[in-house]
């Protein structure tokens, strides 16, 4: 029986929550924080926390990005993504994720190259943000 599908807590949920609580979330922009989980070469896995109504700056990708929504929802030029949905993006997609006003959003994102932002000011601080 699938406990998660039945809406029950997984026995690992507490373990994962405790492990994440010991790590430091880094602010990226107002309403946006990240927690880098793993890095290997250019590949990075991170969690993003986005407050309700947060707009991520317009960007494309230098490589591939896979994003899975763990909580909440966001919309962009590709559609609306809610809990359990996965977005697969590459350099052919330019988008601006916008979080639903109804609640916050937590997403797991794995990239194999840095993002490419359109706004020059964001590009200027991008190395400092590690994104």
Ranges and model annotations:
Residues 21-57:
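A short glycine-rich, His/Asp/Glu-containing loop-to-beta-strand
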Residues 51-54, 60-76, 84:
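Glycine- and acidic-residue-biased ligand/ion/polar-headgroup-sensing regions
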């Amino acid at each position: 029986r699938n406990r998660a599908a039945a809406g029950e807590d997984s026995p690992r949920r507490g373990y994962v929550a405790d492990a994440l609580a010991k790590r430091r979330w880094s602010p990226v922009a107002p309403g946006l924080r990240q927690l880098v989980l793993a890095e290997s070469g250019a590949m990075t896995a991170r969690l993003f926390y986005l407050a309700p109504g947060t707009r991520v700056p317009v960007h494309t990708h230098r490589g591939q990005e896979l994003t899975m929504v763990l909580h909440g929802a966001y919309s962009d030029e590709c559609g609306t993504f809610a809990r359990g949905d996965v977005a697969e993006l590459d350099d052919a997609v330019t988008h601006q994720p916008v979080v639903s006003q109804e609640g916050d959003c937590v997403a797991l994102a794995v990239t194999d190259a840095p993002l490419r932002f359109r706004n020059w000011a964001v590009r200027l601080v991008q190395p400092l943000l590690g994104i």
